[in-house]
Amino acid sequence: MYLAKHFLIGAVVYAFAGTALAQRVELQPAPFVQVPFQVDGNSPVSWKDGQLQFFTSDGTPVKAHGADQFALSQPTRIVVDRSDHLPMWIESVWTDDDGTVYGWYHNEPGGVCPDGKLTAPRIGAAVSYDGGSTFYDLGLVLTSPDPADCSAKNGFFAGGHGDFSVIPDRERAYFYFLFTNYGGDVIGQGIATARMAFEDRKMPSGAVWKYFAGAWAEPGLGGRVTPVFRAETSWQRADTDSFWGPAVHFNTSLESYVVLLNRACCKPGWPQEGIYASLNPDPGNPAGWSEPVRILRDIGWGPGYYPQVIGLGPGETDTEVGEGARLYVHGRSKWELVFTKGDFFISGADQPLDPSAPMPGDRLDQTSTGRRAGR
């Protein structure tokens, strides 16, 4: 897969081209909007009775609603039936045909390290029968096999799995997880993937399988991973260089899955080096993700984490998007992304090309180093 980049006046265009039609992602300026309350982590959305349901968390999950993403109410606290996996961040949701909302959460347990400064996140599942106002915890589904390293210098995590998103495939055969592995040897750190059979969504604990060494055969609870995008520098170091926090959606215009990534590099404090995008027509083929391409560097505010899209078309969400979407970074947006497909030539520039940006390259294979991830 090859990449070409050009710049229009007021827009930045990236084109992903392979044997099929070129796939183009265009970044355009848009009027500034901001979610009118605090957000943290990926903030998923769904629809209920013609109203957009917006979920976010700051350790306690909350939900707002509105006619669309630009008219949100103030949030109300989500009731969770048990407290043993608090604090939690609900980072993905999916609504079944009968209105049942399945959610997946990032949990940061206490007591991981003696001084209490570091934790090791885990990923769990929950279900709601009232549109997301109340969730029933279904238990943990993804945990790390590696012991906590309380000497880690990244400032947050001693290991663990977290900062993730979940999406079903188009055939409703599997739910796919893209998550960040913060622990163990650096060769296994970075963005990893796992999947769960669609029919196991009601009883997910023990039903998720991680991708490792070419097979979906490692258990979600304690199994090993082969990263899709491997960390360049370990999360145990202060100067980590790694992608993190994937936000994935299916793009109906491109007929492809698109993931947005943070990249922490290469100083203490998880500085945001940029926001990256990668495409894959089939999440069941982890080697099919294209080399991540930086689409945004100068965000305009800090720390600039948590990129995600919300589609602009009727009924679109953060996981199903058409030709146009708002790009949010930490709950603020001053950009639209336009996704198109077709044969065309791309050239030109309205700003200097960045020599550190990824160059055109082939599809990643299992042994590729990929590139980066972060918090």
What are these regions (language model features)?
Residues 15-17:
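N-terminal signal peptide c-region/cleavage motif recognized by signal peptidases
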Residues 22-86, 94-153, 170-174, 179-240, ...:
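Beta-rich carbohydrate-recognition and catalytic domains
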Residues 9-10, 20:
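Cleavable N-terminal signal peptides
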Residues 159-160:
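Aromatic sugar-binding surface patches on proteins
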Residues 1-9:
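Bacterial N-terminal signal peptides that target proteins for export
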Residues 42-44, 90-92, 163-165, 245-247, ...:
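Conserved beta-strand position repeated once per blade in WD40 beta-propeller domains
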Residues 10-11, 80:
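Intrinsically disordered, low-complexity segments enriched in polar/charged small residues
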